Design a protein with these regions (language model features):
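Extended, highly charged alpha-helical segments
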Residues: 89-109, 198-303, 407-409
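Coiled-coil termination/hinge junctions
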Residues: 295-321
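Generic structural signal for residues positioned in beta-strands
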Residues: 3, 247, 286, 305-307, ...
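ABC ATP-binding cassette signature C-motif
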Residues: 1-230, 314-489
């Protein structure tokens, strides 16, 4: 059993409450997903459960973890810097569990992930693996260690379709506890038996959470129905209040006018009117008490508001965007052949998606295409890499990254756009190393929007986006008036 009691998490820099009085009990066999908007604390919660020291630099935490005999394993959203320069063999041999496995067991583990046993002994550096291969390697090492609790932060990132199906089956077959975050609605719906929803309301000044033992689809449906019922009830009560207040105002004014015009020669009538006014005022006080008990208008987080591509992004129908031929595609070190006879043509506002298995060369191909298109003077191309840090200086703030001129009007405009993407005023001035993966992705997409690009080159653009933001991004890309070249699973 995994239990969390009265957990409170507050951001050290802006004192924003991320979680307040959070309580959770997970039992053997539970598959729990944490959902919520970007920057709502999903990754922070996973890190704290695994090791509170992982969040101590930026968050003040209080609460109790009760783990009992559970053995925890954690898959971070990104490969830690300390592991990037290690070879694949060094990565696996760093755990005793690797040497405790027989060659037969290692072979069986590798086969489950559609890898050869030689993968364990590779000399290739971890940071040169494809995004999907990095995730596979980390998952493999976790399974070798035989934990009882899996803490997985976006485990579906960069995985091909076959490996996504494997991940789904591994989660469903896991006999212990699984707690994970994911932007993949299909994975969530097919695996999760518990939904943990983290919300930040009132411009992220109020934290709220819900824990529901149900499927994600039913939770969303029931939540929408409850929201609609409460909204209707609150609106009905407010409508009745308006009618009641209007009637009360007429009564009050009528008695007040009568009192002001009563003759001194009619003391009995004056007394009756004063008694009536006393009753009317008592009625008003009763109404005030009733108003305090009215159903509150329900609140929920809204999806991000974002624009991608205006008139300047329109691509003429006949314009050749790429006519790309490549005899051979090899790994960056030139040692492994990935593909032969590649020929791609893209004209006008067409949308091109590159798919394939992990390690097939999708990112390598996209990088070469990006290098060509970014150098073209007849196009305005923008590139969003799989690794955001390739373009982002993590010590800079989002505002500084998006505008280096310092112009007040420009910065005001940028802050308005960031606000529409659910950034608080404080988050706009945080170093980007403190932002979540989804928030970093938002910064890059906003950079593309501000640049008036007419060609977007995107490597897994929806990774790290919440299930609420993901559909918005997909619809924006589909409606983009320029060309799009993208990798996606």
């Amino acid at each position: 059993m995994l239990q969390i009691k009265n957990l409170n998490i507050e951001h050290r820099r802006d004192l924003r409450v991320i979680l307040e009085n959070f309580n959770l009990v997970l039992n053997t066999g539970d598959k729990a997903v944490i959902v919520g908007e970007e920057g709502n604390g999903k990754s922070t919660l996973l890190k704290w459960i695994f090791d509170p020291a992982l969040v101590a630099a930026y968050a003040e935490c209080s609460g109790e973890r009760i783990l009992g005999a559970e053995r925890l394993a954690y898959l971070p959203q990104e490969l830690p810097d300390a592991l990037k320069e290690k070879s694949v063999y060094e990565f696996f041999s760093a755990t005793d569990a690797f040497f405790d496995c027989s060659p037969k067991e290692l072979s069986e583990f590798a086969a489950r992930f559609r890898l050869s046993p030689e993968f364990f002994y590779g000399e290739q550096r971890m940071d040169t693996l494809s995004g999907g291969e990095k995730v596979k390697a980390q998952l493999l090492r976790i399974f070798l260690e035989r934990p009882t609790v899996l803490l997985l932060d976006e485990p579906s990132n960069d995985l091909d379709l076959a490996t996504l199906e494997l991940l789904e089956s591994l989660i469903n077959a896991w006999e212990g506890i699984v707690l994970f975050t994911s932007h993949d609605e299909t994975l969530i719906e097919r695996t999760a038996t518990v939904v943990i929803h983290l919300e930040q309301l009132k411009r992220k000044s109020e934290s709220r959470y819900a824990v529901v033992r149900d499927t994600y689809a039913r939770y969303r449906q029931q939540r929408a129905e409850l929201f609609a019922r409460k909204t209707q009830q609150a609106e009905n009560e407010r409508k009745e209040k308006r009618l009641r207040d209007e009637k009360y105002a007429r009564l009050y004014n009528s008695v007040e006018r009568a009192l002001s015009s009563v003759s001194r020669q009619a003391p009995g009538e004056g007394k009756n009117l004063k008694d009536k006014m006393h009753v009317v005022k008592a009625m008003g006080k009763r109404f005030e008490k009733e108003d305090a008990e009215m159903t509150e208008m329900p609140e929920q987080e809204e999806a991000i508001f974002f624009r991608l591509g205006g008139e300047s992004a329109v691509m003429p129908q006949g314009k050749t965007v790429i006519d790309y031929a490549l005899a051979e595609l090899k790994t960056p070190d030139g040692e492994r052949l990935l593909a032969r006879g590649i020929h791609l043509k893209l004209r006008g506002p067409e949308k091109l998606c590159i798919i394939g298995e992990n390690g097939a060369g999708k990112t390598s191909l996209l990088r070469r295409i990006a290098a060509d298109l970014l150098a073209r003077k007849d196009l305005r191309a923008q590139y969003m890499p799989q690794n955001y840090e390739d373009l982002l200086d993590l010590e800079r703030t989002p505002v500084d990254f998006l505008d280096s001129s310092g112009d007040k009007a420009v910065r005001t405009k940028i802050r308005t756009y960031l606000g529409a993407l659910k950034f608080t005023a404080e988050e706009m001035d945080h170093p980007m190393r403190e932002l979540s993966g989804g928030q970093k992705a938002k910064v890059l997409l906003l950079k593309m929007s501000l640049s008036d690009a007419n060609v977007l080159i995107l490597d897994e653009p929806t990774r790290n986006f919440s299930p609420l933001s993901g559909p918005v991004i997909r619809s924006l890309l589909a409606a983009f008036p320029g060309a799009v070249i993208s990798i996606s699973h």
